[in-house]
């Protein structure tokens, strides 16, 4: 099918605290769009403040799909996201609207737009083996091993990203092939015309300031109390993907007495900066991206121009 005759979907991706949500809501209100969230933290219920989830007032103005769809005790994979996103895209198109996919979870965007290769299922024995090695040698040693077998993934996965680092090693030990080799397989192209936007400030200092200000606002809004409520649940712990979300882990460890309040604030802001850096690294290698500068008053007009 010619791309001009295909239905259009819009993606708006960017690092945390770059202004994606406000811009997406403005576009949704002017362009008959409906928003699909592309965020691995916003999927969880009862994780509102630390995930910067849109408020009820904002959601009433511009509803978001794929928010509050999982309990924090549950898992949710990139494959789950791809399936859910496609189902919601089809529902939005059937209603005569344009799907607007907004977020900063680049793995979800990649899964949707490029498809997923059949990776091996988790192997608990190998995971336990990796955990023992980490306990003995540390994460940097595991990252050094990854660099030997898969330098491309090693460049992309930070030593302080335990979930993705251990998974990359696990995949290799199960299959004998690197994550990069296995993900070369491309799925059939989506039957949509995809118009892609990235948003970020030109000056990284501006982003760092926004990250710090937003985290302090979260604390004023009751973020510590939110984590206390989650921590009180017997079924939640720090090994769950939900509790590994940036900010939640650091506040949890503060509540465990691992460090004082000021250290928690500093660690949370640094971890959020590291997340933003990884997001920007993904985006710099993204093809066919129309760049917008955070806070530019012409952004909405540029979006509307591309979307007509």
Swiss-Prot record:
One of its GO terms (molecular function) is tRNA dimethylallyltransferase activity. Substrate binds at residues 16-21. Residues 39-42, 163-167, 244-249 are annotated as: Interaction with substrate tRNA. Its EC number is 2.5.1.75. The record marks 105, 127 as: Interaction with substrate tRNA. Keywords: ATP-binding, Magnesium, Nucleotide-binding, Transferase, tRNA processing. ATP binds at residues 14-21. Its cofactor is Mg(2+). GO terms for biological process: tRNA modification. It is an enzyme of class 2 (transferase). Pfam families: IPPT. It catalyses: adenosine(37) in tRNA + dimethylallyl diphosphate = N(6)-dimethylallyladenosine(37) in tRNA + diphosphate. Catalyzes the transfer of a dimethylallyl group onto the adenine at position 37 in tRNAs that read codons beginning with uridine, leading to the formation of N6-(dimethylallyl)adenosine (i(6)A). Belongs to the IPP transferase family. Monomer. This is tRNA dimethylallyltransferase. It comes from Shewanella loihica (strain ATCC BAA-1088 / PV-4).
């Amino acid at each position: 099918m010619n791309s001009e005759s295909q239905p259009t979907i819009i993606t708006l991706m960017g690092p945390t605290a770059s202004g994606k949500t406000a811009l997406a809501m403005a576009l949704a209100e002017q362009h008959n769009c409906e928003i699909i969230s592309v965020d691995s933290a916003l999927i969880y219920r009862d994780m509102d403040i630390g995930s910067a989830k849109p408020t009820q007032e904002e959601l009433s103005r511009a509803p978001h799909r794929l928010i509050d769809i999982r309990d924090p005790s549950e898992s949710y994979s990139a494959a789950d996201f791809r399936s859910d996103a496609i189902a919601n895209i089809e529902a939005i198109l059937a209603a005569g609207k344009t799907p607007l996919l907004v977020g900063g979870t680049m793995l979800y965007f990649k899964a949707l737009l490029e498809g997923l290769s059949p990776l091996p299922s988790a192997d608990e024995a190998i995971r336990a083996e990796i955990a023992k090695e980490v306990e003995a040698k540390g994460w940097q040693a595991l990252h050094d091993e990854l660099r030997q077998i898969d330098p491309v993934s090693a460049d992309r996965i930070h030593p302080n990203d335990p979930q993705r680092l251990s998974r990359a090693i696990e995949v290799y030990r199960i299959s004998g092939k690197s994550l990069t080799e296995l993900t070369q397989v491309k799925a059939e192209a989506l039957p949509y015309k995809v118009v892609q936007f990235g948003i970020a400030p030109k000056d990284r200092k501006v982003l760092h300031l926004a990250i710090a200000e937003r985290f302090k606002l979260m604390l004023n809004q009751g973020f510590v109390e939110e984590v206390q409520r989650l921590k009180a649940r017997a079924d939640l712990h720090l090994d769950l993907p939900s509790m590994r979300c940036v900010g939640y882990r650091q506040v949890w460890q503060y509540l465990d007495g691992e460090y004082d309040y000021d250290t928690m604030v500093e660690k949370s802001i640094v971890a959020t900066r590291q997340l933003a850096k990884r997001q920007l690294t993904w985006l710099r290698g993204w093809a066919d991206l129309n760049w917008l500068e955070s806070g530019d008053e012409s952004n909405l007009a540029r979006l509307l121009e591309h979307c007509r």
